[in-house]
């Protein structure tokens, strides 16, 4: 029965909108459900209040497993007596500790157990576990124009549509965690710079059987298809071959990535890893609104990870989806070759920036040479993740003689937004930032890029000369044009 909420619950619901509280009792933690996701029956994510220690959390988790075992034993006896009592519950599934900033667990419990859990004084709220999916994509014929677009201020033309201008060291020293369906780590485009990190779904294989994660990885760090061509990809599999999974598995995957990042930071401080420049992560997935997933992503950002997430493909307000609504990640909408908002792209104040997302060619599964061309904000977000890795690689390494204060995710997000091409897109709603990602036009000087010296002079000269060469081609001087065009535009 729904009723009035205590004041202590109000901050959670303000953060949670659009979520519903489907079960309210006095002195009990609320149970939250998303308004636009499919719940997984009898599956829950339990989040502890701030201030609960790791030892207290462990004691609670031991307690909940004990009462689960007890109720299951009683259930088994009833099932032996009454054949219609055939439900079985699995108990504790995952435990969560995101660098001490968010503690909790997930599991499959009956109503008797969950009622005891929600009355425990350490519990802040309970969220129904729900389905998460790789954002739907459309397979079409096309060309990899996205890299070219983020390296030019002006709309692409005949001379620039396939010219990616970039710093050669882009991505070097940066780890990229692709939290998705996995990655075809044997693909030649990764040049050995991809490794399997972790498989979260129980009893699943360490392969990408879907292709979605491999495509995202290629856009981030592939030799031919990638923004940051020297970054190292870590596959974090949270979705099964079908492209779907559970919210609790995704949360656990984010935790694993954050822990791996912190381990690399520690190894660098010990002198065991040279040239480390930081970690980025991409999540081209989504489901309904989840307070927990948004908070977990924000906590991973708080420990130093740079996160890009897809806005979603429902042509709707991105604030109604997770992780698109997370506050500290960079939420990415999709643009087209003609500089329009892609017809499917979500929008709204939770969208931070746009990047190419229609007809994007990248790596695929099936062989180490496979490629595919698909569309979606899933394809836009990896452009930003790659750009985060690209910009991080332009910083001095923390173990070098030229080391400077580490650039924080908040600073990087602010800088990326500040240098983006403004008002470049059409069909952008009034409450949505009209910003298109830009990589600095080939400059390898990050300070120069963010300082406003946006390499405009170089690009202006290149663009002007390209136009002149195109005129030569039109006048029949094709041989001269073919000889000079690559030199001028590169």
Swiss-Prot record:
Domain called Peptidase S8: residue spans: 144-450
Q: Which InterPro entries match?
A: PCSK9_ProteinaseK-like, Peptidase_S8/S53_dom, Peptidase_S8/S53_dom_sf, Peptidase_S8_His-AS, Peptidase_S8_Ser-AS, Peptidase_S8_subtilisin-like, Peptidase_S8_subtilisin-rel, S8pro/Inhibitor_I9
Q: What is this protein called?
A: Subtilisin-like protease 8
Q: Which GO terms describe its molecular function?
A: serine-type endopeptidase activity
Q: Locate the Inhibitor I9 domain: which residues?
A: 43-133
Q: What class of enzyme is it?
A: hydrolase
Excised during maturation, the propeptide residues are: 27-134
Q: What does this protein do?
A: Secreted subtilisin-like serine protease with keratinolytic activity that contributes to pathogenicity.
This entry's Enzyme Commission designation comes to 3.4.21.-
> Which sites carry carbohydrate?
282, 455
In which compartments does the protein localize? Answer: Secreted
Organismal lineage: Eukaryota, Fungi, Dikarya, Ascomycota, Pezizomycotina
Q: Which UniProt keywords apply?
A: Glycoprotein, Hydrolase, Protease, Secreted, Serine protease, Signal, Virulence, Zymogen
> What's the family?
Belongs to the peptidase S8 family.
Signal peptide region: 1-26
Q: What is its main location?
A: secreted
| Active-site residues, record numbering mapped to chain | 180 (charge relay system), 212 (charge relay system), 378 (charge relay system)
| GO annotation terms (biological process) | pexophagy; protein catabolic process in the vacuole; proteolysis; sporulation resulting in formation of a cellular spore
Pfam families named among the record's database cross-references: Inhibitor_I9, Peptidase_S8
One Gene Ontology cellular component term attached to this UniProt record is: vacuole
């Amino acid at each position: 029965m729904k009723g009035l909420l205590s004041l202590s619950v109000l901050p959670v619901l303000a953060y949670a909108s659009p979520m519903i509280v489907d079960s309210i009792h006095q002195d009990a933690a609320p149970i939250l459900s998303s308004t636009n996701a499919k719940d997984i029956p009898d599956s829950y994510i339990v989040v502890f209040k701030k201030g609960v220690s790791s030892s207290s959390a462990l004691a609670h988790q031991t307690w909940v497993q004990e009462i689960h075992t007890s109720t299951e034993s009683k259930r088994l006896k009833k099932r032996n007596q009454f054949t219609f009592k055939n439900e079985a519950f699995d108990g504790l599934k995952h435990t969560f500790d995101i660098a001490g900033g968010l503690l909790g667990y997930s599991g499959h419990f009956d109503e008797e157990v969950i009622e005891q859990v929600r009355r425990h004084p350490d519990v802040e709220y309970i969220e129904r576990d729900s389905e998460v999916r790789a954002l739907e994509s459309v397979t079409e014929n096309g060309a990899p124009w996205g890299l070219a677009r983020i390296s030019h201020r002006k709309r692409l033309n005949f001379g620039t549509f396939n010219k990616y201008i970039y710093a050669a060291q882009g991505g070097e020293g940066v780890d990229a965690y692709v939290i998705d369906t996995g990655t075809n780590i044997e693909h030649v485009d990764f040049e050995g710079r991809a490794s399997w990190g972790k498989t979260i779904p129980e009893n699943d294989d360490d392969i990408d059987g879907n292709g979605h994660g491999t495509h995202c990885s290629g856009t981030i760090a592939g030799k031919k298809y990638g923004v940051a061509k020297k970054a190292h990809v870590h596959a974090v599999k949270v979705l099964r071959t079908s492209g779907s999974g559970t919210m609790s598995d995704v949360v656990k995957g984010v935790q694993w990535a954050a822990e791996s990042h912190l381990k690399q930071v520690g190894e660098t401080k010990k002198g065991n890893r040279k040239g480390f420049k930081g970690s980025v992560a991409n999540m081209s997935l989504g489901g309904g609104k989840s307070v927990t997933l948004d908070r977990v992503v924000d906590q991973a950002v708080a420990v130093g990870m740079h996160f890009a997430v897809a806005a979603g493909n429902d042509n709707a307000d991105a604030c109604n989806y997770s992780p698109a609504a997370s506050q500290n990640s960079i939420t990415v909408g999709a643009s087209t070759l003609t500089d329009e908002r892609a017809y499917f792209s979500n929008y709204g104040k939770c969208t931070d920036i746009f990047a190419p997302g229609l007809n994007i060619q990248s790596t695929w599964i099936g062989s180490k040479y496979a490629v595919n061309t698909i569309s979606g904000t899933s394809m836009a977000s990896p452009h930003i993740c790659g750009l985060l890795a690209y910009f991080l690689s332009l910083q001095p390494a923390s173990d070098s003689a030229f080391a400077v204060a580490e650039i924080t995710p908040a600073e990087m997000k602010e800088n990326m937004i500040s240098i983006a091409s403004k008002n470049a897109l059409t069909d952008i709603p009034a409450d949505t930032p009209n910003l298109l990602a830009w990589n600095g036009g080939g400059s390898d000087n990050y300070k120069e890029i963010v300082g406003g010296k946006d390499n405009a002079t170089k690009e202006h000269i290149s663009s002007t000369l390209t136009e002149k060469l195109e005129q030569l081609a039109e006048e029949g001087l094709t041989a001269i044009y073919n000889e000079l065009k690559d030199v001028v535009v590169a």
